[in-house]
């Protein structure tokens, strides 16, 4: 009843206490490509499913390096994500210049969440239509955070966002207790398994072209693994499938 009256203004609440533009931005995140994040004591891993606009087009980049100790996976509008990524890079660079040390991951996430929030309150702006999964490592250990267009952010042991992310969450909820002691290779394998759950068609599979992996941890600067470099992890996933079938 009230939706048409209030869904074009970011500064006005509807009578039911909702801001529809924020809900639309959240929907953009839900419709984006799936991304999974998980961590152990020493490492944090991002795994993302890349999409291609057509058979003639290349796959869109979904994981970005922010600094040596932190990176992001995105779901939603890539252009908005690029703006936020540049903002995060500038914040890390400025902090490093002033303090000659790396910014703590939580502080960086708080800053980008505040930037999200400004666009939910000021007239003439729209919310960023993108959700971020932030993976980082600092003196406090490995971290996984999720940011939302609403300006909220959350700390997780493991999480997934994007299209059909609930299937990946179900896998993560069943196995997250074992993640803490996992090696980097095992953590990546769990991430790929969770991401595989988001693929609806049995004819589609994870391959080196549509998968992107980001890793960071103790003694490991943030690194993106794609194309041929990702194939060994996909091979490991395929080799473990018959074992799963036998144990079931």
Swiss-Prot record:
UniProt subcellular location: Cytoplasm; Nucleus
Lineage: Eukaryota, Amoebozoa, Evosea, Eumycetozoa, Dictyostelia
SUPFAM superfamilies, A to Z: N-terminal nucleophile aminohydrolases (Ntn hydrolases)
Record keywords: Cytoplasm, Nucleus, Proteasome
PROSITE patterns, A to Z: PROTEASOME_ALPHA_1, PROTEASOME_ALPHA_2
GO terms for cellular component: cytoplasm; nucleus; phagocytic vesicle; proteasome core complex, alpha-subunit complex
InterPro entries per the UniProt record, alphabetical: Ntn_hydrolases_N, Proteasome_alpha, Proteasome_alpha-type, Proteasome_alpha1, Proteasome_asu_N, Proteasome_sua/b
Main location, first listed in the record: cytoplasm
The protein's assembly and partners: The 26S proteasome consists of a 20S proteasome core and two 19S regulatory subunits. The 20S proteasome core is composed of 28 subunits that are arranged in four stacked rings, resulting in a barrel-shaped structure. The two end rings are each formed by seven alpha subunits, and the two central rings are each formed by seven beta subunits. The catalytic chamber with the active sites is on the inside of the barrel.
Family annotation (Gene3D superfamilies): Glutamine Phosphoribosylpyrophosphate, subunit 1, domain 1
Role, per record: The proteasome is a multicatalytic proteinase complex which is characterized by its ability to cleave peptides with Arg, Phe, Tyr, Leu, and Glu adjacent to the leaving group at neutral or slightly basic pH. The proteasome has an ATP-dependent proteolytic activity.
Coiled coil: none
Family assignment from sequence similarity: Belongs to the peptidase T1A family.
Protein name: Proteasome subunit alpha type-1
Annotated GO biological process: proteasomal protein catabolic process; proteasome-mediated ubiquitin-dependent protein catabolic process; ubiquitin-dependent protein catabolic process
Pfam families: Proteasome (PF00227), Proteasome_A_N (PF10584)
Domain of life: Eukaryota
């Amino acid at each position: 009843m009230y939706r048409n009256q209030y869904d074009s203004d970011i500064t006005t609440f509807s009578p039911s206490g909702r801001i529809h533009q924020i809900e639309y931005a959240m929907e953009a995140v839900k419709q984006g490509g799936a991304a999974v994040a998980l961590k152990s004591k020493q490492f944090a891993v991002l795994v993302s499913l890349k999409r291609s606009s057509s058979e003639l087009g290349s796959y869109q980049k979904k994981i970005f390096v922010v600094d040596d100790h932190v990176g992001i996976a995105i779901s939603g509008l890539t252009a908005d994500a690029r703006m936020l990524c540049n903002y995060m890079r500038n914040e890390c660079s400025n902090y490093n210049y002033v303090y000659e040390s790396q910014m703590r991951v939580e502080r960086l996430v708080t800053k980008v969440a505040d930037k999200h929030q400004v666009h939910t309150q000021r007239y003439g702006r729209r919310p960023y239509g993108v959700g971020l999964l932030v993976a980082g490592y600092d003196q406090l250990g490995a971290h996984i955070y999720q940011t939302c267009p609403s300006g909220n952010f959350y700390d997780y042991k493991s999480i997934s966002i994007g299209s059909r992310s609930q299937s990946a969450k179900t896998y993560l909820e069943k196995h997250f207790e074992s993640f803490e002691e996992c090696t980097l290779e095992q953590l990546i394998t769990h991430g790929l398994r969770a991401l595989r759950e988001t693929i609806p068609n049995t004819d589609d599979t994870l391959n080196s072209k549509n998968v992107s992996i980001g890793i960071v941890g103790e003694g490991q600067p943030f690194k993106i693994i794609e194309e041929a470099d990702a194939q060994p992890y996909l091979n490991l996933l395929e080799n473990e499938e018959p074992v799963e079938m036998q144990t079931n």
